[in-house]
């Protein structure tokens, strides 16, 4: 993978950690994210229409598939943040997606993964696990697995699968349509799928707009711009590699926790970050 692609993924990953922090601070997490997606789709409209193309039946199938899993992702992530802490949910959601996407990439997309690339993906997964530890002692080694018993962790894990699923559809989609036009269609369809929740929770919608309108708009811009960067990378790179490198957002999340939320920068967080960086280097050389 080229340095330009890795740099774009780094920027997208940083933006991803920023909007997750803003989403965690919101009131109704699911409504907040749906409103952000709606605003993002509206902002993208003129740019997408300028790149409009004829849409084949295959492209529509891919768009619908992506929209379904993207809708599920926002619902699951919002549900997870409503039940658990950012420090638990974010690493689990981002850390599980590389595992799923490698399986999907190899067995469904028929991507060939070199031994160095596979080792890099494995390092990223291990690094995210280490970063998730509270301390280096036997009592804490199984803590990340024990946490899977909670509903919040289960939602986070499912959101990781949703990321892998829509990433697989998107890998195909950007080969069929212009990335901007494709993303607008998938995003717009996601809004339609999620619209019933907005209608059913009108009071929550009004309250969220009243209390968090600036954050909603900020997240809308960040989600839209950040994922467009990823789609451009997917045009010329393996989905398994691109999605795995996006796991660096967990490192950015830990750094934000230390700087913004004044969380302690523990040895596991430092070592986990270094392991993730080593994994990214391996993928870059693959």
Residue ranges and their predicted role:
Residues 1-7, 99-161, 268-286:
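Juxtamembrane helix-loop boundary signature in multi-pass membrane transporters
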Residues 1-68, 74-86, 133-155, 188-224, ...:
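Membrane-interface interhelical linkers
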Residues 13-17, 45, 67, 71-75, ...:
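Hydrophobic/small/kink-forming positions within alpha-helical transmembrane segments
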Residues 36-37, 93-94, 117, 177, ...:
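Residue-level recognition of transmembrane alpha-helices
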Residues 38-42, 125, 191-192, 252, ...:
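Small-residue-rich packing faces within the transmembrane alpha-helices of Major Facilitator Superfamily
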Residues 69-70, 82-129, 183-191, 239-259:
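Specific alpha-helical transmembrane segments that line the substrate/conduction pathway
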Residues 148-181:
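Selected transmembrane alpha-helices and immediately adjacent juxtamembrane segments
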């Amino acid at each position: 993978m080229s340095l330009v692609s890795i740099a774009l993924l780094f920027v997208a990953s940083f933006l991803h950690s920023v909007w997750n922090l803003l989403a965690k601070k919101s009131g109704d997490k699911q409504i907040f994210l749906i409103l952000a997606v709606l605003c993002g789709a509206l902002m993208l409209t003129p740019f997408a229409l300028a790149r409009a193309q004829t849409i084949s039946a295959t492209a529509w199938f891919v768009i619908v598939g992506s929209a379904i899993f993207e809708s599920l992702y926002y619902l699951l992530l919002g549900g997870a943040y409503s039940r658990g802490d950012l420090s638990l949910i974010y690493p689990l959601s981002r850390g599980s997606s590389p595992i799923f996407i490698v399986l999907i990439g190899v067995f469904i997309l028929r991507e060939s993964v070199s031994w160095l690339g596979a080792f890099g993906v494995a390092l990223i997964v291990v690094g995210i696990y280490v970063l998730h530890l509270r301390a280096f002692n036997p009592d804490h080694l199984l803590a990340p697995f024990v946490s899977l018993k909670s509903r919040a962790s289960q939602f986070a894990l499912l959101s990781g699968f949703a990321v892998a699923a829509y990433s697989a559809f998107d890998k195909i989609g950007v080969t069929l349509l212009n990335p901007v036009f494709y993303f607008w269609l998938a995003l717009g369809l996601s809004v339609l799928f999620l619209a019933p929740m907005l209608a059913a929770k009108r009071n929550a919608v009004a309250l969220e707009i009243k209390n968090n309108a600036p954050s909603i708009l900020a997240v809308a811009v960040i989600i839209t711009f950040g994922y467009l960067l990823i789609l451009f990378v997917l045009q010329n790179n393996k989905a398994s590699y691109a999605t795995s490198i996006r796991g660096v957002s967990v490192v950015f999340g830990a750094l934000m926790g230390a700087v913004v939320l004044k969380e302690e920068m523990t040895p596991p967080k430092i070592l986990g970050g270094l392991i993730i960086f080593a994994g990214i280097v391996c993928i870059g050389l693959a």
